[in-house]
Amino acid sequence: MHATETTDFVSVRIITDDVARLVDFYEKATGTPATWATEDFAELRTPTATLAIAGTRTVPLFAPGSARPADNHSVIIEFRVDDVDRLHNALTDWVPDFVSGPTTMPWGNRSLLLRDPDGNLVNFFTPAARPQVN
């Protein structure tokens, strides 16, 4: 069985104990300014998706205990960039937790893995050049 309504995937929300710190990190890392709704909620909007960052005080609005900050070990937050090597050079002075430097993956993407201040895994990648199919 599946839903009959059309759906659009539009955002990922990170729950954090320190919204300002995490927003500052993602603004610096992506060059995308945040739009603040309240002190507990901000969004970094790109043309293709939105990264929402919310404080722990928002969790009870959904269901108490339904989300916990800094407790993610299964999701990778991914950003496509023009030049992952150039980005790595720009981030090196202030990002303390690189998981791996720029690496070409078996599927061809060039990826840079790091952890944000809450420990979430973040992948900045440059897509592989795709051969044109005739």
Task: Pin down the residues of each PLM region.
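Short hydrophobic/aromatic beta-strand micro-patches
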Residues: 15, 78-80
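Vicinal oxygen chelate
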Residues: 1-10, 32-78, 86-115, 126-134
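Conserved beta-strand-loop-alpha-helix junction that forms the acyl-donor binding cleft
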Residues: 13-18, 106
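Short, conserved charged micro-motifs
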Residues: 21, 84-87
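Conserved active-site tyrosine of GNAT-family acetyltransferases
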Residues: 22-27, 91, 119
